[in-house]
Amino acid sequence: MRSIIIYSTTDGHTKKICDFINSNSSRNNFEVLSINKISNLEIEKYELIVLGASIRYGKYSPLVFKFVKNYKKILNKKKNAFFSVNVVARKTEKSLPETNPYIQKFLKKTNWVPKKIGVFAGKVDYPNYNFI
């Protein structure tokens, strides 16, 4: 099955999750591609499309919303999934798609209903932020 994971990341943590999914998938060999590099992507050739996106300062990248808007009809005809990477998912009460506020806002804003939805706790890498 031809499969792709398209991801949006800021510090690389979402990309690491995508690579982990790809290396641990027994049924699929995913192509893993940054949302920044999909300008000429022929998305209709894939049977399974996964979109992974991280939250930065409370928001997804605008490219994530643009992607869903541009490809929603194709996504709905394919096997698809969406996962969010965000820090609040570290809290038990926000660790499920049904209780994660970022996923709920995303679903409402895009009016897309992915066939599978996941949420992963994000990483806050304080030492690399160079506050001082």
Role assignments for model-derived ranges:
Residues 9, 36, 86:
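Short beta-to-alpha linker loops that shape the active-site pocket of alpha/beta-hydrolase fold enzymes
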Residues 2-27:
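N-terminal beta1-alpha1 ligand-phosphate binding loop
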Residues 51:
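Redox-cofactor binding/interface segments in oxidoreductases and associated redox assembly factors
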Residues 24-33, 48, 57-132:
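FMN-binding flavodoxin-like domain, especially the glycine-rich phosphate-binding loop
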Residues 38-45:
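Short amphipathic alpha-helix with an adjacent loop that forms part of the alpha/beta core around
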Residues 1, 44, 112:
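Structured loop/turn residues at beta-strand edges in well-structured enzyme cores
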